[in-house]
Amino acid sequence: MLSPCPALPPAECRDSTDLPADPPGRVLPLHRLKRRPRGWRPERPRERLLERGPAALTDDELIALLLGTGKPGHDVFATARVLVTQFKSLHGLLEATADDFEAHPGIGPARSARLVAVTEIARRMLKEKAHEKQPIDSPGAVEDYLRLKIGARPYEVFAAVYLDARHRLIDMEEITRGSLTRMAVYPREIVRRAMVHNAAALIVAHNHPSGAVQPSAEDRRLTRVLHDALALVDVRLLDHVVIGISDTFSFARAGWL
């Protein structure tokens, strides 16, 4: 039979109750956080998030919170670490599909659906933010969106961002895809698409799956040809952005446009 703590006031006696033990690898449920003992310090990710905010958590821990609990034989934190390592970055995770997630033995359809839903929310939020922005005068205004869309692709993608006369976003679309070493880009097709969108200005971008962002001689030649072709139809090429894994290169910032 349990007895009260006779040497302590009732409130302190109640506060001295230990939190129930949690199995290893399981994120603590919210209802377990309602009563905390005096001197308690947050250790688990959810506890630290509630105490200090999401910035206090690592990427692995944020992913672990999304997963919730581990599958039998698969620790949730180990699964989160493997995901971040496998996809190399959070941008890589945002590009992953449900099949990519379910290829990991620690993730089933339910957890895969949860991850895909969160990444799609992030993608839509960035798109909304880009549409709500003030006129765009630099590549930095759409850089995050471009990195999210094409930065983690294992193949090269050439994309165009169409802007109106006030440099507000009209649309963004992929023009072409290619191999790791070769991609065919036709300036006349980009000019045609700019006219279809009734664009007054354009930002083009392509990714380097290798991670290096230094433009090649062919990148510079293509940019000059595209600049001149767009000028013939009164469309201004504002920038050409090269996107790596964690860095970008702007032709405009380098003074090449």
Curated annotation (Swiss-Prot):
Domain spans labelled MPN: 135-257
Locate the residues binding Zn(2+).
Answer: H206, H208, D219
Please give the family membership noted in the entry.
Belongs to the UPF0758 family.
Keywords of this protein's UniProt record, alphabetized? Hydrolase, Metal-binding, Metalloprotease, Protease, Zinc
> What broad taxonomic lineage does this protein's source fall under?
Bacteria, Pseudomonadati, Pseudomonadota, Betaproteobacteria, Burkholderiales
Question: Pfam families of this UniProt entry?
Answer: RadC (PF04002), UPF0758_N (PF20582)
User: Which residue stretches belong to region Disordered?
Assistant: 1-28
Name the Gene Ontology biological process terms.
proteolysis
Where is the short sequence motif JAMM motif located?
A: 206-219
Q: Does the keyword Zinc apply?
A: yes
Tell me one GO molecular function of this protein.
metallopeptidase activity
The answer to whether keyword Protease applies is yes
The protein here is known as: UPF0758 protein Bcep18194_A5833
Question: Which SUPFAM superfamilies does this one have?
Answer: RuvA domain 2-like
